[in-house]
């Protein structure tokens, strides 16, 4: 089997990194469009006087924050030298579970399990921010 030289491997890594960067840039632009669409949807839900629309408004706000967090994650990726900080994924997970509790709160056991998952993510976040796991 042909072995690749170090310069070839670096070229492959650079090409793949550029493909990843282009993909994330495209995803970021798509998320900005969805964020704008969600802003219009929230404005519509805000001025509808029905009680059901208030429920939609809260759900829409949480979805809005999810888009916002994903965009912030992509921005942080480019600003931190092509690295995804773990805590941003934890923030997104917490927000997604809160949205799930708001949307699907049919059984108390499900809400309890979702709350336990949030507690586990908060503990993970605390551990990530502690001095033992902090990356310099």
Swiss-Prot record:
One of its GO terms (biological process) is cellular response to phosphate starvation. Keywords: Cell inner membrane, Cell membrane, Membrane, Transmembrane, Transmembrane helix. One of its GO terms (cellular component) is plasma membrane. The chain crosses the membrane at residues 15-35, 55-75, 82-102, 108-128. It is found in: Cell inner membrane. Its main location: membrane. This is Protein PsiE. Pfam families: PsiE. It is a multi-pass membrane protein.
């Amino acid at each position: 089997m042909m072995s690749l030289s170090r310069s070839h491997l670096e070229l492959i890594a650079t090409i793949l990194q550029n493909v990843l960067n282009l993909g994330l840039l495209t995803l970021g632009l798509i998320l900005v469009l969805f964020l704008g669409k969600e802003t219009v949807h929230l404005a519509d839900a805000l001025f509808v006087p029905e009680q059901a629309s208030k429920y939609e408004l809260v759900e829409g706000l949480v979805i809005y924050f999810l888009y916002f967090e994903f965009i912030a994650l992509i921005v942080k990726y480019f600003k931190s030298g092509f690295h995804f900080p773990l805590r941003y994924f934890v923030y997104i997970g917490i927000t997604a579970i809160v949205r799930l509790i708001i949307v699907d709160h049919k059984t108390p056991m499900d809400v309890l399990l979702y709350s336990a998952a949030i507690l586990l993510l908060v503990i993970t976040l605390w551990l990530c921010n502690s001095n033992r796991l902090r990356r310099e």
